[in-house]
């Protein structure tokens, strides 16, 4: 409970709010990248507390929102095949394609099942050798390792009826697209702590330098987010544009190396 209590402490949060409001000499516009951060910000009313000194714009960090229509239509075409057992996380079932969604395919007789892990999909492939089991692999960098592990495990076990519809996206191109937009107002980012725990933050450094925006790797609890905002506002006030790490308890600059040895990061 230490980390839960420490990063949800109301007194610490109030102190950080005062610090942010005292530091800001003008209105600053920040974007949190991750949907988990957005959830905390909205649930705790942090955006309302900090307005008008800091405006928070909610970012693209939801796999459901960034999965392309083309990929959804591919998933629907596969799920409708009688020889396919199609598996997906539950939040993808009602995402519409050009004509319908996975829930409707299931209602029409398609074998569409909700799983909680790609390894669950692999287990279904083992149990149903007469079906081609497809896992809809959506998400950012954080979901890629588990999906890769399932494919590796399938190869180890010699499971030939398991496949993955890969729909991964990465965060940096999304940030660049936002910054390149003619109507962009974002002046700094809170980067997703869990993504950076896997990838590190080196790929954000050129973005910060090129676009002159502070990028703060940030966790998900209220105190995490307020600390991240405080660091970003301080950089903006001082005219600095760097990558800083608020989420020091989980993230290292180089992320997790291929051998998984975090001591080297």
Which stretches of residues belong to each language-model region?
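Metallocofactor- and cofactor-centric catalytic cores in central/energy metabolism, strongly enriched
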Residues: 1-130, 144, 148-157, 165, ...
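Short, surface-exposed amphipathic charged segments that create phosphate/polyanion-binding patches used
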Residues: 71-74, 126-133, 177-182, 204-206, ...
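Phosphate/pyrophosphate-binding betaalpha-module
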Residues: 136, 140-203
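A conserved active-site cap/scaffold subdomain adjacent to cofactor or substrate pockets
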Residues: 165, 183-252
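Secondary-structure boundary elements
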Residues: 127-131, 153-160, 181-184, 213, ...
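Conserved small/polar residues in nucleotide/adenosyl-binding loops
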Residues: 264-265
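Short catalytic-loop micro-motif centered on adjacent basic/acidic residues
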Residues: 30-32, 113, 134-137, 163-165, ...
